[in-house]
């Protein structure tokens, strides 16, 4: 017996599936999850550039300085710059003679 005859059987002169009309909760849950997965995948492909560009560039901002006095903001900037300047000494400059 072939796989085709085990899965699909002729019903009233039509081809149908044995699982039609199944009220098994597992089948219903799997169908819902499958449909939601398909919808989310399609949205992801359509909005790929918008979504990932937002994550890539939108989240690279520094900590919020809202409500922080200007003097503390300037001090923070100096600390960040001095950390960058200190790290520059790590690299060796090789100059051709």
From Swiss-Prot:
Sugar attachment sites: 20
Location in the cell: Virion membrane; Host apical cell membrane
Site (Seems to be involved in pH gating): 41
One GO CC term on file: virion membrane
Keywords: Disulfide bond, Glycoprotein, Host cell membrane, Host membrane, Host-virus interaction, Hydrogen ion transport, Inhibition of host autophagy by virus, Ion channel, Ion transport, Lipoprotein, Membrane, Palmitate, Phosphoprotein, Signal-anchor, Transmembrane, Transmembrane helix, Transport, Viral ion channel, Virion
Virion surface membrane side: 1-22
Control of this protein's activity: The M2 protein from most influenza A strains is inhibited by amantadine and rimantadine, resulting in viral uncoating incapacity. Emergence of amantadine-resistant variants is usually rapid.
Modified residues annotated as Phosphoserine in this record: 64, 82
GO biological process: protein complex oligomerization; symbiont genome entry into host cell via pore formation in plasma membrane; symbiont-mediated suppression of host autophagy
Spans traversing the lipid bilayer: 23-43
Site feature Essential for channel activity, possibly by being protonated during channel activation, and by forming the channel gate and the selective filter, where: 37
Membrane topology qualifier: Single-pass type III membrane protein
Self-association and partners: Homotetramer; composed of two disulfide-linked dimers held together by non-covalent interactions. May interact with matrix protein 1.
Entry similarity comment: Belongs to the influenza viruses matrix protein M2 family.
Entry text on domains: Cytoplasmic tail plays an important role in virion assembly and morphogenesis.
Additional detail: When the channel is activated, one or more imidazole moieties of His-37 probably become bi-protonated.
Protein name in the entry: Matrix protein 2
């Amino acid at each position: 017996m072939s796989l085709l005859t085990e899965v699909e059987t002729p019903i009233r002169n039509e081809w149908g599936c044995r699982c039609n009309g199944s009220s098994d909760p597992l089948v219903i849950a799997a169908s819902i999850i499958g449909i939601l997965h398909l919808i989310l995948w399609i949205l992801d492909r359509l909005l790929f550039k918008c979504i990932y560009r937002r994550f890539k560039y939108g989240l690279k901002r520094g900590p919020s300085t809202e409500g922080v006095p200007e003097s503390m903001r300037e001090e923070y900037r100096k600390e960040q710059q001095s950390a960058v300047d200190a790290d520059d000494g790590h690299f060796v400059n090789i100059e051709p003679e």
